[in-house]
Amino acid sequence: MGKKRFFDDRLKYLSFIQNTGEKKAISEKIYPYISRLSQNKSYLRILDAGTGDGTINANIIKSFHRYHPYTSLLITGKEISYEDLKNTLEKMPDRFVEHPNLLVTMTNVKFSELGLIESASKVNNKKIREFNLILKSDNSYDFNSQITGNKLGDFIKKYWGIEIDNKGRTSYSNPCIVRIYREDNSRHLKQFLLSLIHI
């Protein structure tokens, strides 16, 4: 095993992030950039890597809707941790109500592999595991039931695992991608979905 870092210990890491103003400070640094984006954009892509517990991700969506309520937001989160993935997804139901024109993508691959995850069938000689959750209804209660439901939950439990090599380095057991969007807003996202979904 390599040298142990404080964020390798889950309890120490959670204690740190829950008792500092780091996420609030980072979010507040981002808001001015979002407010100054051109109003003429039809869409915006944002990469949040790693998402951690999803706080900054959720704050970005809130801020984006404040200034660009009708613009398509394609936000990709990169996170290898099973727990952080769940925490991030649990923050999304309200965001889909607030900003319907939203495509949330979550993946666990490395930075160098992000360009492959949407266009290839394999990454690092491993089959890409995909799950597309198309949200039905129009309220956060129903969205929460679907996002935290068994179908997506079973996919995550089965495929979103971690492997550790003999040097203590972590990697995914399967390259995964999860996409979530509202069915009643798919017409606005169609141009992006046609090029992404290949299952």
Q: Which residues does each predicted region cover?
A:
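Conserved S-adenosyl-L-methionine
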Residues: 50
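Generic structural signal for well-ordered secondary structure
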Residues: 23, 53-54
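Conserved strand-to-helix beginnings and helix N-cap segments that scaffold or border functional pockets
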Residues: 27, 57-58
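Conserved beta-strand elements of the Class I
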Residues: 45-47
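Class I SAM-dependent methyltransferase Rossmann-like catalytic core
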Residues: 1-41
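Conserved small/polar residues in nucleotide/adenosyl-binding loops
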Residues: 197-199
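Class I S-adenosyl-L-methionine-dependent methyltransferase module
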Residues: 39, 53, 59-195
